[in-house]
Each structure stands twice: as structure tokens, then as C-alpha cells.
Amino acid sequence: SSEQVAVSWSRALASRPETDRQVTGEDMRSYMGKTLETIAELMLPEIEPALGMEIMRDCERVEQDYLIEHGGTLFPNLEKELERLSKSFSLFIVSNCQSGYIETFLEYHKLGKYFTDFECPGGTGLAKADNIRIIVERNNLDRAVYVGDIQGDLDASDSAGVPFIHAAYGFGTVNRDVPAVKSFSEVFEAAERILGSTR
């Protein structure tokens, strides 16, 4: 959804007299996986932090409204793969997004039926590693694996004590060799190698 989010954030920023910043899809891809505070520092370095966060909250509000109407761009065969995964594994989402983003995405694309639970810092105020731990504890998981695409995801998995699969088709790289997949359709086999079948 990076292109859609870029459009919505640019609309929000256009209404703010403090900045003439516009956001591209490439910008958004570089921000993916980062907390809102970090994005504010990167995107609006000339603006003092409290005002930067106020502007980011405006971006969030416009983004939610935009995504409710337009959704995001899905990976090819995403729903088919989610269905296949959900037959063997319980699926969860842990993301560094704001509160409401996951719900909006799942509702627009009618994908909620494949997921058991989700968490984000917008809901807890906590970092990704803590939110991974919350999901594991809240759902009484004795085995889990986290699929992510950037170094911060690997760091969060390490901190939470959860194995990691690098989604190499995503937005970033990681600093060491870990199990990796080149497309979403490879996640099932990678998870099965780490977890076995959980259902």
C-alpha cells in the first residue's frame, strides 16, 4: 500500500502550512516498518518533534479515510496463499503501524477471516518485540515464527526470542543469513521447515 499511503500523506501535508513536503511511493517504502516517531524525524527533520507528531497524526487520519475507499495493492495470489497457510498455521499480524491500519486493510480486502489476532504500537504503545511477545503470550503459542522484510523485524524477532523468516521480496535487507523467501508463495514451506504443521 506504499503508493496509496504516499498519496494520502501528501494530501494531508498539503493542508499543513508548516511544511511543503510531499511524499512519494519510494519515500514510503523507505519508511515501512519504522515507528511513527522515527518517520516524523526522517520526513520532517526541520520541524520540532511535538509538531512533527501532530502532523503525522493528520497523515494517519487522512490515510485511514483513503484506504477505506481505495485499499492497497496486494501481492499476487495473496488470498490463496493466506488460505493455504491458515489451514496449517494460526496467523497473526504484528506491525509498526498506527491503530486502525490493520483493521482497515483486513476489512477492505476481506482478509480478516485468515487471522487469529494482531497487534501494533498504535494499540499498545510498545515496540515490535514487545508486541510479538504479547501475541505469543495472549494466544498461548509454544512455537512461532515471524516473517518480516527489514532489519528492524529481525532485531524484534531476536529480542522476542522468535525465529525469523526474511521476506526478501519486501522493502529491505538483513545483516545475517537467516531463512529467506523470494515470494509470498514460499512462506508456507519455510514456516513448515521451522515449525512443522501446527494444526
Residue ranges of model-derived segments:
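Conserved donor sugar-nucleotide recognition element shared by glycan-biosynthetic enzymes
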Residues: 5, 36, 74, 128
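Active-site neighborhood of HAD-like aspartate-dependent phosphohydrolases
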Residues: 1-26
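Short helix-capping segments at alpha-helix termini
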Residues: 15-21, 47-51, 110-114
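Helix-loop "lid/cap" segments that line or gate small-molecule binding pockets
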Residues: 10-14, 35-49, 105
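Conserved phosphate-coupling serine/threonine residues in phosphotransfer and NTP-handling enzymes
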Residues: 95-97
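Short, acidic loop-to-helix structural element flanking the phosphoryl-transfer center
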Residues: 65-93, 103, 129
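Asp-based, Mg2+/Mn2+-dependent phosphohydrolase catalytic module
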Residues: 99, 103-199
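Metal-dependent phosphoesterase signature
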Residues: 41-79
